Design a protein with these regions (language model features):
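Alpha-helical interface subdomain recognition
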Residues: 3-5, 12-17, 79-81, 98, ...
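Conserved hydrophobic/aromatic beta-strand scaffold that supports enzyme active sites
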Residues: 5-9, 16, 34-38, 51-53, ...
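A short core secondary-structure module
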Residues: 20-64
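Flexible, small-/acidic-enriched active-site or ligand-binding loops
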Residues: 57-88
């Protein structure tokens, strides 16, 4: 997650910029109308990065074969290759050298979106688990009557409600124009970890059926996993939160 070490370069040529390099793990790679591209225009480190808006059909821009993923099948992810892609200076976003700061500001809002997605996935998994547990009968009664399973459902519901409250509080701070970076990182961390736990437990509630493609909980479990990775891994979220609490690490 060392985003500031990027190697794609943009070189000024009159009123244009010429972009050369490769980008990995690009969402909608190969089908997007536009791409927000961060490229190095100056010194090493964050201050040498500038953002550009590049049309998807720009000359010299090509996409590799999409990655074969365990989830998110509806959104292709692919490498992009920039072979002397020329864009006018009018497509520069912000000032030269502001690209990294722009990207970080977008990450905070993106983390809120991922947190909300995670709670939606978890809610869907719990709904499936409850429906199955109340309909499936063993020993003459619904399996939802068994305390061990009831406690699993209770834990699912508690994690979902806690996560929902956490990301909504961060969203309220954002809407009010207040700092929300720490809360966004907390929401992303908690909600995506909760989604992973809830979906795994939902598969367990359904037993063997949960492991088959005939029921949706296995897909929800696969979809939950990527949410712990995108918009900064959950290990990165812990670093962000800790820096807000204790300051940056000593060097």
């Amino acid at each position: 997650s060392d985003a500031a070490s990027l190697r794609t370069k943009a070189v000024r040529d009159g009123e244009d910029w010429v972009i050369t390099g490769t980008k990995a793990w690009i969402t909608h790679g190969g089908i997007a109308d536009f791409y927000t591209v961060l490229a190095r225009t100056g010194v090493d480190g964050p201050r040498g990065i500038t953002a550009f808006l590049v049309p998807g059909d720009a000359a010299g821009l090509s996409a590799a074969v999409p990655e074969k993923k365990m989830g998110m099948k509806g959104s292709p992810t692919a490498q992009l290759h920039f072979d002397g892609v020329r864009v006018p200076d009018a497509r520069r976003i912000g000032d030269e050298g502001q690209g990294f700061a722009i990207a970080l500001s977008a990450l905070d809002s993106g983390r809120l979106g991922i947190a909300a997605c995670a709670i939606g996935v978890a809610q869907a998994a719990m709904n499936e688990a409850v429906a199955y547990a109340t309909g499936r009968r063993q020993f003459g009664r619904p399996i939802a009557d068994f305390q061990g399973l009831r406690f699993m459902l209770a834990d699912m519901a508690t994690q979902i409600e806690a996560g929902r409250a956490l990301y909504l509080e961060a969203a309220r701070l954002r809407d009010a124009g207040s700092p929300f970076s720490r809360q966004a990182a907390m929401a992303k961390l908690f909600c995506t970890d909760a989604a992973m736990r809830v979906t795994i437990d939902a598969v367990q509630v359904l037993g063997g059926y949960g492991y088959t493609l005939d029921f949706p909980v296995e897909r929800l479990m696969r979809e939950a996993k990527v949410l712990q990775i995108v918009e900064g891994t959950n290990q990165i979220q812990r670093m962000v939160i800790a820096r807000h609490l204790a300051g940056p690490e000593t060097r």
